Design a protein with these regions (language model features):
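SF2 helicase/translocase NTPase motor core
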Residues: 3-55, 59-164
Length: 165
């Protein structure tokens, strides 16, 4: 009896295990201004296609996410959207400018109007047509921590069809 239960449990656990299916691509030449560890993280994220970069304060998350977004936009010829808190949007645009990555702000109530890297804040995401996106970056993804949060569920639902995220 105990062996049957253990066997059933092992089967159950094996069914729950998920294997990573690569959805990414080999990145091109990444910017020289990335440190070696940042380059490796961006390469890893590009190869996965769907990845999360959880790096400590001061390790260059913004530069890494913008480098990834720029690679996706270049690879697909499409639109990549960065969703960020309003307070960090301008800082992200400035950092992109500093490192040669153009980041355009989505007009209020609008949607990205062409290929490239775009940014808007979480409060404006309802105006975005996510079916037009080729990539999505969630800056300050702590917004996803509230497992019962409405914003979290809206993002999950909207991002289902975005190939790179």
């Amino acid at each position: 009896m105990a062996a049957d239960i253990l066997g059933d449990y092992e089967t159950f656990v094996k069914c729950k295990a998920s294997a990573h299916i690569s959805a990414g691509f080999e990145p091109g030449d990444l910017p020289n201004h990335l440190f070696d560890f940042q380059t490796e993280i961006v390469k890893w994220a590009c190869l996965r296609g769907r990845a999360a970069i959880f790096a400590d304060t001061g390790l260059g998350k913004t530069l890494m996410q913008l480098s990834w977004a720029d690679e996706v936009a270049s690879k697909t010829g499409g639109t990549v959207l960065v969703l960020a808190p309003l307070a960090v949007s301008e800082q992200t645009i400035e950092q992109g400018r500093t490192f040669g990555i153009e980041v355009s702000r989505v007009a209020q109530g609008g949607t990205p109007t062409g290929p490239g890297v775009w940014i808007t804040n979480y409060e404006r995401m309802d105006a975005i047509d996510f079916t037009e996106l080729h990539g999505l970056v969630l800056d300050e993804s702590s917004i996803l921590k509230a497992h019962d949060g409405k914003t979290r569920q809206r993002i999950i639902d909207a991002a289902q069809g975005v190939p790179y995220r």
